[in-house]
Regions:
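Short pre-catalytic strand/loop immediately N-terminal to key active-site residues, enriched for Gly-Thr
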Residues: 75, 193-201, 218-220, 289-292
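Glycine-/charge-enriched secondary-structure boundary and capping motifs
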Residues: 2-12, 23-26, 107-131, 139-143, ...
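N-terminal glycine-rich phosphate/pyrophosphate-binding loops that anchor nucleotide-derived ligands
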Residues: 1-91, 130, 165-170, 175, ...
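Small-aliphatic-rich amphipathic alpha-helix that forms the alpha element of a beta-alpha
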Residues: 74-100, 116-127, 205-217, 224-235
Length: 342
């Protein structure tokens, strides 16, 4: 079987395949709003999933995510795609309950490749403590895979992405740069060490970061995916606050900055920059570092907003778990931009 043919890497694999945020905002604004007192979180905001109240003690989190391959190994692709889809449940403050496969695959190609993808995905659902209970498949010229995931949470304890409080510290739980690393690896522009670090990061469930963080007073949370670090951080401000970012403290895969310095960036990063025009102000931040902050991430880390007096202890717990986390900034009174990067 020709795995490389089946797993042909498209121009935009992983979360780089997302539609531009500006386009999505315009389209979603044309959808009728559904009014239901039990719908706690819908699509009227840019949260990571929907939350629907079933009883006084139980609400469900509903989310889905799928994309085209960003790696040639089908088993690894399955694990990354599943980890990415499962992440939204943790970003909403819940635990994974059940998942369904979403499959697009050419029927004339080797089913063993699809079996490897599904095995990788199933292992991640199992690691998350969830149950994989079926799915849906269609014949397609291009391979795509992901999950529809249902999580559970107490109706009073779900997380939003836009409920930061003044004085909060923001923590990032994975290094940035996987978008540029994956895009350039196919052209031989990336060191193997950086590539392996990107693969490890994308396969790591955000379950562990969330479980550590849930012991603290989390005010807001989200995960970093296709809209990049700054795009998702912008959603956290809700246009009410300004988040001051110290760029020198942000962790990234070393090779990503080198790629940016050589102008080997991604189209998705440029779309993110265009969308954030007027919302982000850079102060003496090198262009290459700006690109790292705008880079679309696949299965990226969590952004957690916590009280300043709890940040140090949370960082200790994350470090004890060997999660490459960092404090990236703080929530301040509203200034002339949603985000100011120093």
């Amino acid at each position: 079987m020709d795995i490389k043919k089946i797993m042909k890497l498209p121009a935009c694999g992983g979360c780089m395949a997302k539609l531009p945020p500006g386009m999505l905002k315009d389209v979603v604004s044309q959808i009728p709003v559904f009014n239901d007192p039990n719908l706690l979180v819908g699509f009227d905001t840019s949260d990571d999933g929907a939350v629907y109240k079933l009883s006084d003690d139980i609400a469900i989190i509903q989310t889905l995510d799928f994309f085209t391959p960003m790696v040639e190994d089908p088993y690894t692709f399955g694990k990354i795609a599943a980890a990415n889809a499962l992440s939204d449940v943790y970003a909403m403050g819940g635990r994974v309950a059940v998942a369904l496969n979403i499959v697009c695959f050419p029927e004339e190609d080797d089913p063993a490749v699809l079996a490897s993808i599904l095995r990788g995905g199933a292992e991640k659902v199992m690691e998350a403590g969830g149950v994989l209970c079926g799915g849906h498949s269609i014949n397609d010229r291009e391979c795509k895979y992901g999950l529809s995931v249902t999580g559970v949470v107490h109706p009073d304890k779900y997380l939003r992405n836009n409920t930061c409080k003044k004085g909060d510290v923001i923590i990032l739980t994975k290094p940035l740069g996987v978008g540029m690393i994956m895009a350039s690896y196919r052209y031989g522009e990336v060191a193997e060490e950086d590539y392996q670090q990107a693969l490890k990061s994308m396969q790591t469930l955000n379950k562990y970061a969330f479980e550590a963080a849930s012991k603290f007073h989390l005010h807001a949370g989200t995960d970093v995916t296709g809209f990049g670090f700054l795009g998702h951080l912008n959603e956290m401000t809700n246009d009410d606050y300004t988040i001051a970012v110290e760029s020198k403290g942000i962790k990234y895969i070393p090779g990503a900055l080198k790629l940016a310095q050589e102008f080997l960036t991604t189209g998705g990063g440029q779309k993110n920059r265009n969308f954030l025009k007027g919302k982000v102000r850079f102060q003496n931040v090198p262009d290459a570092m700006q690109e790292v902050l705008l880079d679309p991430q696949t299965s990226g880390g969590m952004l957690l907003s916590v009280p300043a007096n709890e940040a140090k202890e949370l960082m200790k717990e994350l470090n004890d778990l060997e999660l490459p986390s960092c404090i990236i900034g703080e929530v301040q009174e509203r200034q002339d931009a949603n985000i100011i990067v120093y």
